[in-house]
Amino acid sequence: MAAGLPPVQYSIDTDADLETRLAGKGLKVVEIFSEWCGPCKSVLPTFRRIRLDKDDENALLFLTVCAEKCNFLETAKEHRGKSEPLFLLYRNGQLKARIEGANTPALNQQVLSLTPANADVDDLEENPMYLAKMERERIARGETVKDAKGAKKGKK
């Protein structure tokens, strides 16, 4: 493998990191695994091949999340203690597919059909996770809805 290539998968260790990744553009393949099992190794060659075929590295990200350490996704909490991985495919912050187990053909088909050619085709204003994150940040800064709307108008 050539030097300088991005990793195939990113390990997500915090709920904040997961939220930030899902609030972005492009397809995010989130593997939920049990702590005692670890991430699924059988799907890595498929993920590597698909990832290397993409020109825009932001159009597709593979993420691994330990079910026992994740509180951000209700689905992750429900998956605790299970032996098979669960794959959740998010496009522009919206759940598009759910694949249980290491079903490589189904993963391959779904990833290829859902991955945009370029992440810029997604609109963050249509990403519910992005909008929720921005709202929480606005509230944390003590801004009102009126302040946020005024700031938006000033940018145009």
UniProtKB/Swiss-Prot annotation:
Disulfide bonds: 37-40
Naturally occurring in which organism (per UniProt): Chlamydomonas reinhardtii
InterPro entries: Thioredoxin-like_sf, Thioredoxin_CS, Thioredoxin_domain, TXND_domain-containing
Record localization: Cell projection, Cilium, Flagellum; Cytoplasm, Cytoskeleton, Flagellum axoneme
GO terms under cellular component: cytoplasm; dynein complex; microtubule; motile cilium
Cited Pfam families: Thioredoxin
Domain named Thioredoxin: residues: 2-116
Gene3D superfamilies: Glutaredoxin
Alphabetical UniProt keywords: Cell projection, Cilium, Cytoplasm, Cytoskeleton, Disulfide bond, Dynein, Electron transport, Flagellum, Microtubule, Motor protein, Redox-active center, Transport
Name of the featured protein: Dynein 16 kDa light chain, flagellar outer arm
PANTHER family assigned to the protein according to its UniProt record, in alphabetical order: NME/NM23 FAMILY MEMBER 8, NME_NM23 FAMILY MEMBER 8
Function text: May be involved in regulating the redox state of functionally important thiol groups within dynein.
